[in-house]
Amino acid sequence: SLGFDFSKGRLDTSIHPFSGGTPDDVRITTRYDEDDWTGSLMGVIHETGHALYEQGLPIQWRGQPVGAARGMVLHESQSLLMEMQACRSSEFYSFLAPLIATEFSVEGNQWTPEALSRNSRRIVPNFIRVDADELTYPLHVILRYKLERALLGGDLVVSDLPYAWNDAFESSFGIRPPDDLRGCLQDIHWYDGA
């Protein structure tokens, strides 16, 4: 229903959600948490934004600049548009609520479109960027940007990054990462320049 063409792609499971491929073969992966299905849903929606961008590239221009993705900035804009805007809208939850009721055999006030929409917009600080809410997600990006500037400017050495990360995270989010896995090492995208 989001427009992903499964005849030109597929969805699989992995440790961390990602997508990639060519316009005629785009692969999406996600992870599942049986205690919180919403994280999986939003991960799939985010990766679907990437996949739709790839599937929309002109196949006839493959191998030429005009047929290539314009970079990670545009890629992320498309995925975040799907995740943070289109699929957190009341219209989306009006579509989704009956599907949830049918697939999970649930009913009650917490499963109405309005309740699902409110739940998706809760502001709760999270150590993990890809699980962040729509307000704190940009703070994750700003934190990385500031630390990158300090590293590149010579004001921070790599060995001090975990401490600098934890201090800056606590200052911005009000919570302190308990370990590097939920701190400076939690995001594979940061190290590959995305």
Segments predicted by a language model, with ranges:
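A generic secondary-structure signal for well-formed alpha-helical elements
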Residues: 2, 6, 52-56, 60, ...
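Active-site-adjacent bridging/hinge elements
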Residues: 15-27, 51-58, 113-122, 177-184
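Beta-rich nucleic-acid/ligand-interaction surfaces
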Residues: 16-22, 65-75
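Short helix/strand-bridging catalytic loops that position acidic/His residues to coordinate divalent metals
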Residues: 29-34, 60-71
